Amino acid sequence: MKKLLIAAMLFAAPIGLSTASAADYKIDVEGMHAAINFKVKHVGISWLTGRFDKFDGSFTFDENDPSASKVIVDVDVSSVNSNHQKRDEHIQDPGYLNTEANPSAHFESTSVEVTSDDTGIIHGNLTLNGVTKPFDLHASFVGMGDDPWGGYRSAFEATAVIHPEDFDYKFKYGDVYLELYIEGVRQ
């Protein structure tokens, strides 16, 4: 009986040790395993797509209680890249992104609302063009696991819509649609 109890404890020990809890992650911008893309109507007719090349951030993901997770992302708005240098310079002007006066954007979550096993709404505050407003990211869990370099990663994707007038932008091309692809390395 004693041997059976010891065997049962040894078998159960690894399971207990692997129980997931909150973990901190750094967004992998070095390996380009993350992206912030956008699309907006080009003169109200077709889609103009692009991305922000410079951003950084971190998140805490609690696998057992995703509602306790947290996200912080900082974006260098002047790193806007629409694959056309002259247009990118124009987009940075005061009439558009106003990057000289407000070169960065900041998002910080305030809560996470779990909507299904692998989706949720990340509620937070977005500071853009010097204006801070409540802002939601509609997120989906993509996956997690060991990487080939001895680390551990978690990945998510999210969408959001920016209403330019909410952030004192004057351009009239409609809403800006964001797609975020985030892979983090556990710290």
Tell what function each PLM region has:
Residues 20-187:
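Low-complexity, acidic/polar, glycine-enriched regions of mature
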Residues 3-6, 24-25:
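Short, basic/polar N-terminal leader/transit segment immediately after the initiator methionine
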Residues 6-7, 184:
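Conserved short hydrophobic patches within well-ordered secondary structure
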Residues 7-16:
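Bacterial N-terminal signal peptides
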Residues 1-4, 18:
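Positively charged n-region of N-terminal signal peptides that target proteins for export
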